[in-house]
């Protein structure tokens, strides 16, 4: 399993519950397309965490990098309903940071 981790802060004037609803709508559409397995949205608690990373962490899980690339391809088209859903997310955030992780050790690890 691969995890695309995203850290963001709310953009000025954005509301936290609206961001979560937008993320759920967008990633739900990607899941319906078969390009995302699951996701979670988490919020920093009590201010604990590195200041470089945002208050919100979004973890998007895919079976493999091929599936993740398909999700990126949907976003890259920048048209239609998928773009409308994407705008609903990124218009509410700032200070975007991301990372890519995988389960470890993975199935191909020999030693």
What are these regions (language model features)?
Residues 2-10:
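Active-site-flanking beta-strand signature of metal-NTP-handling nucleotidyl enzymes
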Residues 6, 19, 58, 68:
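Hydrophobic pocket/interface hotspot
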Residues 29-37, 51-53, 59-100:
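An amphipathic, aromatic/His-enriched active-site/gating alpha helix that lines ligand/cofactor pockets
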Residues 1-2, 49-52:
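Short, flexible turn/loop "capping" segments at secondary-structure junctions
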Residues 10-14, 62-64:
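Structural beta->alpha junctions
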Residues 42-47:
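Short, solvent-exposed loop/turn elements at beta->coil junctions and helix N-caps
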Residues 14-41:
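Short amphipathic alpha-helical segments
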Residues 97-111:
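Short, low-order "capping/linker" segments at domain edges
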């Amino acid at each position: 399993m691969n995890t695309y981790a995203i850290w963001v802060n709310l953009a000025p004037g954005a509301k936290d519950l609206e961001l979560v609803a937008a993320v759920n709508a967008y990633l739900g559409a990607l899941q319906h397309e078969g390009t995302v397995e699951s996701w979670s949205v988490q919020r920093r608690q009590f201010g604990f965490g590195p200041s470089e990373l945002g208050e919100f962490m979004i973890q998007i899980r895919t079976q493999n990098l091929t599936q993740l690339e398909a999700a990126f391809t949907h976003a890259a088209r920048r048209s239609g309903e998928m773009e409308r859903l994407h705008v609903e997310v990124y218009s509410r955030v700032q200070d975007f940071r991301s990372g890519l992780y995988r389960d470890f050790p993975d199935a191909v690890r020999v030693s």
